[in-house]
């Protein structure tokens, strides 16, 4: 897959390759392509097309990162400067556009309308989720349902598509395809919920970013929503002021409120429920080392610190 990524990043425009390689070289978990490849293994598909589509998924994800960092005005990702900080906003946005268009070129090469439909829908839903999150910024009254709706669009949808693509490549039955998609959606939901916990309780040295970055950017995530529900009137006022202004000068107080209300434990419990839903969805697959790896992946998400 890495060879495919390297080859398809090529462009006659030097800056495109420079920025693309900069963000790809930053590392990352490669979770979405790994999910696709593991699911292909679980379904017995060994064709070369799996590497092409794994690269497509990674390109789409990388494009969203480039655009997200511009929208969020982020300066640090994975412990080093974001592409927009290093190269400027215009270049980052345009290279993100290039990665989207290159991904669509590659999915056309697959020659399967179902694959193109799956990826086109996923890309559209991700964009809708990002816009909805933008509309929800600094909203202290955001509900848990509204929060879940956003993360299922902007994060879980690409996990879902990755798992579904494996089923399409393997020519699986509609029942198996649906189970794969269910696994991906639940896994992606758990991943984002844990990510939101880490903004208040993560290992800064491993994350490569600071605690409270989401709050500073105006993102209202599940730990804050639960803390708002459970806090005293004074605590709610403190949280509301921070949410509406993005002021993290009282971050120590905010962290104490989140801890005292049990918001982190409740959020982790939500992630655990989603991880179990993912594991349960795998019951339709034969018991192989690949299925075991997919089950382990769901369990490991709950214990990550970055």
Enumerate the predicted regions with their spans.
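All-alpha prenyltransferase/terpene-synthase fold signal
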Residues: 1-306
């Amino acid at each position: 897959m890495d060879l495919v990524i390297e080859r398809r990043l090529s462009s006659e425009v030097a800056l495109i390759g420079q920025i693309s390689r900069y963000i790809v070289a930053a590392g990352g978990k490669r979770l979405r392509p790994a999910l696709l490849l593991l699911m292909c293994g679980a379904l017995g598909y060994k064709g070369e097309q799996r590497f092409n589509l794994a690269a497509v998924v990674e390109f789409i994800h990388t494009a969203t990162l480039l655009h997200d960092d511009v929208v969020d005005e982020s300066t640090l990702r994975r412990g080093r400067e974001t592409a927009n900080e290093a190269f400027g906003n215009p270049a980052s946005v345009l290279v993100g556009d290039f990665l989207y268009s290159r991904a669509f070129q590659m999915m056309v090469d697959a020659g399967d309308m179902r694959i193109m439909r799956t990826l086109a829908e996923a890309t559209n839903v991700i964009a809708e989720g990002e816009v909805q999150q933008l509309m929800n910024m600094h909203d202290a009254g955001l509900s848990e349902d509204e929060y879940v709706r956003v993360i299922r669009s902007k994060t879980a949808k690409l996990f879902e598509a990755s798992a579904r693509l494996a089923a399409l490549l393997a020519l699986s039955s509609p029942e198996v395809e649906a189970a794969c998609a269910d696994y991906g959606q639940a896994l992606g939901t758990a991943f984002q919920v844990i990510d939101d916990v880490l903004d208040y309780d993560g290992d800064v040295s491993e994350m490569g970013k600071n605690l409270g970055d989401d709050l500073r950017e105006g993102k209202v995530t599940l730990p804050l929503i639960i803390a708002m529900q459970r806090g005293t009137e004074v605590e709610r006022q403190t949280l509301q002021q921070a949410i509406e202004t993005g002021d993290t000068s009282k971050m120590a107080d905010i962290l104490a409120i989140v801890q005292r209300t049990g918001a982190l434990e409740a959020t982790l419990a939500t992630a655990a429920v989603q991880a179990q839903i993912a594991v349960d969805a795998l019951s339709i697959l034969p018991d192989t080392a690949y299925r075991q790896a997919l089950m382990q992946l769901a369990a490991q998400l709950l214990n990550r610190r970055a």
